[in-house]
């Protein structure tokens, strides 16, 4: 499903501010893999997701999604088959548009543009059904501006929008980090439910090591632009936070 072959990315090359964010990183995800990604600040986690999504083209290597080499594809072309949720609840939605309008845009992502304006009643019923599963009462607020929603409501809506068309790959970049603990748990529970139900291949960055262990079927740790630890199955289930802290200490030489 996802095959990354020796990708490298350097920022400000040849200057005093040169930063090697990715160093020949290789990674393969099978169909339906739910991989949690941990690592310290500057480990290359967000750069990896930005490379996959096309925000930052890689300097070397190849990125293959569902058998197609997308290394040279621009970001807008990859958006047709990728879903992404960012850390900031303000990203991923149009604040001045209504909930139903945001859902309509997500549903039409990648489709040929037409001159037709408006949302059919049959679509509204579909949107209500989708929103009910969030348990946030948004099904009764279809015309409400998204900018008026709370951070948790907006992030849950963004997650729903990112998965409406069952993306080839779902990228979650610390998507609960800006939420309070109660809301974060609700969004994480919803994430696990949607990923399992749709059998989505998923990469989820998190700084919460407990969540990294509990969620998904596989865990990778990054350090200085590469994967230094990759664990799955029963071995992952049996991990403790102390185990991961020890791995961090080993990597940083402490």
Description of each model-found segment:
Residues 1, 10-24, 74:
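A short, flexible loop at the N-terminus of ABC-type nucleotide-binding domains that lies
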Residues 226-249:
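Conserved beta-strand-loop-alpha-helix hinge in the C-terminal portion
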Residues 15, 19, 57, 69-83, ...:
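ABC ATPase NBD coupling module
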Residues 61-69, 229-231:
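Conserved ABC transporter NBD signature motif
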Residues 162-163:
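ABC ATPase C-loop
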Residues 53:
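Helix-to-loop junction immediately C-terminal to a conserved catalytic motif
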Residues 38-40:
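The feature captures the beta-strand-to-loop junction immediately N-terminal to the Walker
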